[in-house]
Amino acid sequence: MAGNDNWINSYLDAILDAGKAAIGGDRPSLLLRERGHFSPARYFVEEVITGYDETDLYKTWLRANAMRSPQERNTRLENMTWRIWNLARKKKEFEKEEACRLLKRQPEAEKLRTDTNADMSEDLFEGEKGEDAGDPSVAYGDSTTGSSPKTSSIDKLYIVLISLHGLVRGENMELGRDSDTGGQVKYVVELAKALSSSPGVYRVDLLTRQILAPNFDRSYGEPTEMLVSTSFKNSKQEKGENSGAYIIRIPFGPKDKYLAKEHLWPFIQEFVDGALGHIVRMSKTIGEEIGCGHPVWPAVIHGHYASAGIAAALLSGSLNIPMAFTGHFLGKDKLEGLLKQGRHSREQINMTYKIMCRIEAEELSLDASEIVIASTRQEIEEQWNLYDGFEVILARKLRARVKRGANCYGRYMPRMVIIPPGVEFGHIIHDFEMDGEEENPCPASEDPPIWSQIMRFFTNPRKPMILAVARPYPEKNITSLVKAFGECRPLRELANLTLIMGNREAISKMNNMSAAVLTSVLTLIDEYDLYGQVAYPKHHKHSEVPDIYRLAARTKGAFVNVAYFEQFGVTLIEAAMNGLPIIATKNGAPVEINQVLNNGLLVDPHDQNAIADALYKLLSDKQLWSRCRENGLKNIHQFSWPEHCKNYLSRILTLGPRSPAIGGKQEQKAPISGRKHIIVISVDSVNKEDLVRIIRNTIEVTRTEKMSGSTGFVLSTSLTISEIRSLLVSAGMLPTVFDAFICNSGSNIYYPLYSGDTPSSSQVTPAIDQNHQAHIEYRWGGEGLRKYLVKWATSVVERKGRIERQIIFEDPEHSSTYCLAFRVVNPNHLPPLKELRKLMRIQSLRCNALYNHSATRLSVVPIHASRSQALRYLCIRWGIELPNVAVLVGESGDSDYEELLGGLHRTVILKGEFNIPANRIHTVRRYPLQDVVALDSSNIIGIEGYSTDDMKSALQQIGVLTQ
């Protein structure tokens, strides 16, 4: 046991210096790794808990406790060993609880999968089952191989990319400044540049957040930044005034504050509304240039990462434009990894990472996307396969049925497309740069400045350089690399180690997580006495990174990436491009990258000996090193941006043409198009009598504006059009007091039109918006969905003793073409809405399920149908500015209540005892309301009551009425 006591000496001082709270158990999380909840002490404890068996920790405590002599006994050592041992025990408890939970849920999910696959198998053609199994492209989508349309035949395209978090700019990117500004930022910027240079592409917009915080460069606050491509040019393509690639910064969230990605969720709808305005304006502008006056709508809206995924889904639904999605780092994969560590519970993880919001956004992205772009097959089969909305076997069968023209029973699956990431080839190495091992062909004065900044660390700068480029975060596993280097004397004698860990000023000013990792690295350098053998420069420019690769290649070194999991592996491709062989993690993208490039070795990132052995083997075997270098340079063209864009655009061409419904006969008749302000009444949490009073009082206080035509009204509800008409007739009101009705939970829009010369109720005919019907039919399951829901409804029962009673029944009277209604007998026994949505996704039925009428009715509508989306549709079609819209809601409502609150419109919450108490449909949310709605936003106000004075004051406050 004596050998296992050494960890005490290396960690105890740092733990004690951090204070009593360093590993206290009364905080919400034991070892939170992000956003100010991480300390060096916690990181050290994590290393201990991970690396040592619970029995060893317990024995160490016993030894400390057994020292009875005052000279020998160390009370602090005794206390700390006891506390760390208990942390290890708690870790095992978490692991056991999570294992039980997964074990309990797995049979249910597997049964649903089996039933669905069986349904699909019943109608397969003879021979179809066996044929699919061996075809990887049929398994879940397309790889980059195979026949596809030629990009030269593409019309001039407008493409929209979205990446919301981090610091995004075209030049001098601050990669590594924080956890949100990493490889993804570089990827989307270079993708935008490359696409804009591709044949057939007219304009690419990269939409991100405008940041006006005082501690950040002014460039992040510029509304528009033109991106200049330095890669490949298309001289034959005509360019117009608005062609090219641009970063468009949309203001949303607090104007003077930078937000981490975990805190962006409440402001997503605000971004969507701002992006809608930009896309509509730009489409019309491009149309004037190249579209003969007709708007040129985006060919695709492509979201990157979960937050941008849900934004792209909402934009796709509002505009009826195809959506693509790239997940980058998936929430379920992160959640599973954190739970396996067993250090904190699901609730604690969600508190820190808002992981439930992230996973739901990714599920919704699967629902809405036509294609999902992955970088590797492993990402599809092991990561996306964790999601309710995707399953490899079912995807294979659905793809086969589509190819055969067979019935899919209303089921849909997004196409998974494997397109490896591209890299900029502007700095590709040439053979002559490697000529001469001993003599430098260029004078020292011509060497890039960053070379001297690195070489000054080394006692012997001529040794081969092991290079790592990674942010100082635990998942990058930099400490294991330093340990592997420090513990292998032959490797230390053979090579130097260079760590490019972002830019920093002072460690004390870094975020806690980065500071902890960097402190650990410096401690290890001191412990192994690696001075003169390890370089860790404080600063470098993004433009100097290729020079750093070239320096490592000049010394005949190697690039190493031993992250626990690597999603993309762009740095590996960049290293190969500069003639540098690689040592890479065997988890993630490097596996497939190395299959293509064949330029290095793969290792287990958890095995320090394997890391050291692989590095020594590669650097000591000159023939192996040369072969890896040559293979990398020979095959690197497969990861070029032109190749990436060619594959990308060939997939975009396969998407069905869709565009917003702007134009048509009703534009000339609908009065809504001339309104300055629109008041939307969406109050669900009141009885019909209170709803009528709210309508009357609102119209009363805006009588002057209504008469002048400057203000219009929209009723937004889950009621059918016949129920709305009956309500207004019973109240003695004409339907024409409203400009439009959003009914059936957003699946229908009606306009009240006169059928005679006198304004009587009987002569007002509600005219349905046919364009809206076409707008929302995307992936609607129709009769196949209805049959499955009817079957499901028979299984939802309440039990009284031995008697089972069905509680959900089909309701044809309140159903329509795009709304399947079900009557609920006993809302208290309803399954949570999240479970119903999970079931629909497992069945590949893409729809939006809602509980309404105090959970006495279930409405199932198309995936892009909702009251919130219908409002955006009206604004786009009739040219209404969202900031001029006021939405009236109650204190609660139908299950889509949260969607009505956020955005650029003004929201008035009517508070008071007249509200029906919130029922269980709002008490079983996947995440708290405040996680997705900024209730303290200046766009949201609350009033007590709905009297005329109350309504007048509220409408004056939001600018609909003058003071």
From Swiss-Prot:
GO biological process, one term: sucrose biosynthetic process
InterPro entries hit by this protein: Glyco_trans_1, HAD_sf, SPP-like_dom, SPS, SPS_C, SPS_pln, Sucrose_synth_GT-B1
One annotated GO molecular function: sucrose-phosphate synthase activity
The enzyme's E.C. designation: 2.4.1.14
Keywords: Glycosyltransferase, Transferase
Tissue: Expressed in germinating seeds.
Keyword Transcription regulation: no
Substrates-to-products reaction catalysed: beta-D-fructose 6-phosphate + UDP-alpha-D-glucose = sucrose 6(F)-phosphate + UDP + H(+)
Listed CDD domains: HAD_SPS
Protein's pathway: Glycan biosynthesis; sucrose biosynthesis; sucrose from D-fructose 6-phosphate and UDP-alpha-D-glucose: step 1/2
Top-level taxon of the source organism: Eukaryota
Signal sequence, renumbered to the chain: none
Induction (free text): Circadian-regulated, with the highest expression 1 hour after the beginning of dark period (in 14 hours light/10 hours dark cycle).
Region (Disordered): 111-150
Subunit organization: Homodimer or homotetramer.
NCBIfam families the record matches: sucrsPsyn_pln (TIGR02468)
Family the entry assigns: Belongs to the glycosyltransferase 1 family.
Cited function: Plays a role in photosynthetic sucrose synthesis by catalyzing the rate-limiting step of sucrose biosynthesis from UDP-glucose and fructose- 6-phosphate. Involved in the regulation of carbon partitioning in the leaves of plants. May regulate the synthesis of sucrose and therefore play a major role as a limiting factor in the export of photoassimilates out of the leaf. Plays a role for sucrose availability that is essential for plant growth and fiber elongation.
Name of this protein: Probable sucrose-phosphate synthase 2
Native organism: Oryza sativa subsp. japonica
Organismal lineage: Eukaryota, Viridiplantae, Streptophyta, Embryophyta, Tracheophyta
